[in-house]
Each structure stands twice: as C-alpha cells, then as structure tokens.
C-alpha cells in the first residue's frame, strides 16, 4: 500500500519520510486535487531537501512547487514508496520567471541571465559566458551521458548529432528510436568538424575541452558541461534545461531533482543507524572487459555507496582508474559490483580466476551486475535516482524489503521518458541486460 505525503506521520522503525504517491495527469496535476497551505507547510518541514555535497538547502518555494500535485489521501503504510510519478506537478507557464525555478537555479549555482527576446546567457563549466538563441531546435550533443539528460527533459527528438556510443545503446534506441537518425561526428573523443557542421546545430554540447574549442572555432554556439558528484548532476540538469530554454525542460528538471533529492534522503535515513561494521566494503569495477579498472571513493560511485550504507574498498581514488590485483585483494571487499553492459563477462572472469577466490565477496558469492538503462546507472546518469534504491536494496536487502524496484523503474520511465516499460523490460534493465529484441 502506498503512503502519500499528505498521510499522517507514523513513527515506525526504520521508516523514512515519504513523498506523495498521486499519479500526475497529462496536465501535470494530481486528479485528486491540491493541498491546503497548512498541510503543505507541514510536509515541507518533513521534506526539506539538501544538496549533500554543497550543503545548500533548496528553498520552500521549490518544495511547495514539488508538492502541488500531491493528493489528499490519508492512507498510511510503512512502505517506502518514492514514486517518480508523484514527485511534482507541472509548473505553470513562464517557468523561468517562477520563484521555484529561481530558487533551484540559485541552489545549484547556475549563472544565467535572460533577455526580453527569450535569448539567454549561460555561464558554462569552463567559465565561458555563452549566448543561447531564444529557440533551440537542433542540438549536437557530443557528451554520451548528457544525451540521457535531454531525453529526460523531453528534447531528445531535437538531437541532430550525437556520439557513436549513444547511437548504439540498446535501451536508448528502444526508448527514443529517432536517435539512430542523428549523425555521429564523434568517435571516442575525436570530433569530425565537417560532419558536425553538416548537422547544422543551433547549439553544441560537450564535456571535452578540445571538442568545445574546435566547435567554437567553427563558429558554433557551444556549451561545456560535466559533473563528478550529485551536486554536479543537479547543476547539469538545470544547465541543460536552460540550454533547451523551454518550460517543459525546466518543469522536468524541477520534477527530476525533487525525486532525486527524496531518494537520497530516503536511503540515507534508512541506513543511518548502521554501525561501521555493518557497512560493507564494496569494490566497483567500471566494466567487465577490464576487472582491474575501478571506481574509487573520490567519485560519484563513492558518493552513492556512502549514501546507501556502504564503504568504497578503494579509498582515495577517482573513477576509471587501473590498480593492481594485489591492491584489490588487500582491500578485501565484501561485495563487488561490475558496471557496463559487459558486466557478466567480468563476473565470469573473476570466478574463473583462482587469484580472486579468497576475497570475501567472491567466497560469499556477492558479485553483482550494475543495472544499465538508457545509460549506465552507476555514473553520470539521471538514472542515479533509481540506482540509489537498487544499491540500498542490493547491499542491505533486510532494510529495503518494501522497495519494489521493478515498479519504481517502470514509473520512472513513464514519468520522465514517456515510455511504458513492461515488467520484463524493467527486470532486464535491473539485471544489466539488453532488450530482448
């Protein structure tokens, strides 16, 4: 049974504060109606959101906007629903001028100024002030992960140039088949400027400094983005919404960040009482093709491990770092998670290699495939919001028995991508498997 945000607070053991559970209508409103100001103010007290790396509190205006769509049901339960479909109602027109959006822009540290004609000046991650056109119809998204952000913000159909990796990602193609029609001027980090120009983009997005310089030298409006932690993820979503410049994108950004914040809060509270000995040491391997390339504590991987009641077994190392097998053995991980769509290859090679056999995770068969959806859940992904729930339930199943990962995944895809996953499709994503067809 689902518990709505309007339900009375129940003091149950290890039960988190809950988001609203009302489904949004096509207009972005809960059909059940709105909340009284008094009720909303109480809800806000329960759900004040913080950006955990920066320590910036999101303001009451954002929270009130997020709760506008919650129904008035008083059904209570100890189930920890954090349904994506219930995170926030659609913000009214002219979102850019709304207090909720202004507060979110401020909280995430985004620098943006607006002109009367609808054009905008955005300060990108390189510190460059980029003047963006009032209307952005054609986008060259040269950063793999940010293609997923544009999918979430409702603008993936405007991507006219992308990367070879994204054009081949099975779940992205399943959700947005049009991505296969986009040109692919980027292979690895190499940019073919001539091919990029043929796509005639209004705006180019990239994480790579050299690509940005080449695109700007070719006379293209170019924005450099990127992030390494949850605070950066939220900032990146807001910046991308401003690149797109639509109310739909800004509304989706508010909705998504509200959902992400609630899931962060939920898993942290659910695992808060664990002692240090109860927090497993986890080794995260970037992909199955190279089992000594790991993601250490100084990364978003280390951040979600900490949030979900675990410790990264490789301390003081960033992501995608090659270390020795001896270092891995010495770190004695209690669990091993392998990322990427080739995760099973890595798990099989670990099990077949006698050098790994005395590692606690291997002896106790605690080897897991990371989920992979429209992008890898473990890094640079908007599906990090789901990954928090998966990691919590995987590493501490006894604490998360009431989390239905299939249901959460299906609702996330429906709410943020407009795609209705079947139960089998959701299970395949959670297992790190490609679509059946």
What are these regions (language model features)?
Residues 141-199, 203:
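A short, structured surface patch at a secondary-structure boundary
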Residues 29-48:
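Short, Lys/Arg-enriched N-terminal segments with co-localized hydrophobic residues
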Residues 187-188, 192-206, 325-341:
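Proline-aspartate-enriched helix->loop->beta-strand connector
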Residues 50-71:
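Secretory targeting and sorting signals
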Residues 129, 213-291, 314-315, 369-436:
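Extracytoplasmic substrate-binding proteins
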Residues 69-80:
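Bacterial lipoprotein signal-peptidase II cleavage site
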Residues 125-127, 182-194, 317-325:
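Short helix-initiation/N-cap motifs at beta->coil->alpha
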Residues 293-320:
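Alpha-helical, coiled-coil/dimerization segments enriched in small aliphatic residues
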């Amino acid at each position: 049974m689902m518990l709505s945000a309007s339900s009375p607070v129940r003091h149950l053991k290890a039960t988190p504060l809950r988001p609203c559970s009302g489904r949004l209508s096509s207009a972005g409103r809960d059909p059940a109606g709105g909340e009284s100001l008094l009720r909303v103010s109480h809800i806000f007290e329960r759900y004040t959101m913080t950006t955990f790396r920066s320590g910036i509190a999101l303001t009451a205006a954002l929270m009130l906007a997020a709760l506008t769509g919650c129904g008035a049901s008083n059904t209570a339960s100890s189930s920890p629903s954090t349904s994506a479909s219930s995170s926030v109602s659609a913000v009214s027109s002219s979102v850019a001028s709304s207090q909720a959006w202004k507060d979110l822009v401020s909280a995430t540290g985004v620098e943006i100024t607006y002109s009367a004609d609808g054009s905008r000046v955005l300060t990108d991650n390189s510190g460059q002030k980029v003047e963006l056109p009032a209307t952005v119809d054609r986008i060259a998204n040269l950063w793999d992960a940010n293609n997923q952000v544009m999918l979430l913000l409702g603008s993936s159909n405007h991507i006219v140039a992308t990367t070879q990796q994204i054009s081949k990602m099975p779940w992205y193609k399943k959700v947005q088949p049009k991505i296969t029609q986009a040109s692919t001027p980027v292979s690895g980090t190499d940019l073919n400027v001539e091919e990029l120009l043929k796509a005639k983009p209004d705006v180019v997005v990239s994480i790579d400094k050299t690509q940005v310089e080449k695109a700007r030298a070719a006379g293209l409006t170019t924005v450099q983005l990127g992030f390494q932690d949850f605070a950066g993820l939220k900032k990146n979503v807001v910046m991308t919404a401003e690149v797109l410049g639509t109310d739909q994108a800004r509304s989706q950004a508010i909705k998504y960040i509200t959902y992400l914040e609630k899931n962060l809060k939920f898993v942290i509270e659910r695992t808060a009482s664990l002692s240090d000995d109860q927090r497993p040491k986890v080794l995260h391997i970037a992909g199955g093709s190279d089992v000594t390339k790991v993601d250490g504590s100084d990364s978003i991987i280390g951040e979600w491990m900490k949030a979900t009641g675990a410790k990264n077994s490789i301390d003081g190392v960033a992501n995608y770092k090659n270390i020795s097998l001896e270092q891995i053995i010495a770190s004695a991980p209690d669990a091993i998670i392998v990322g990427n769509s080739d995760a099973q290859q890595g798990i099989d090679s670990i099990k077949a290699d006698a050098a790994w056999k005395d590692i606690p995770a291997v002896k106790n068969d605690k080897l897991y495939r990371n989920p992979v959806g429209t992008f890898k859940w473990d890094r640079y992904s908007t599906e990090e919001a789901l990954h928090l729930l998966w990691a919590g339930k995987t590493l501490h199943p006894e604490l998360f028995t009431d989390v239905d990962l299939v249901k959460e995944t299906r609702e996330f895809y429906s709410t943020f991508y407009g795609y209705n996953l079947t139960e089998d499709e959701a299970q395949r994503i959670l297992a790190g498997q490609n679509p059946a067809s």
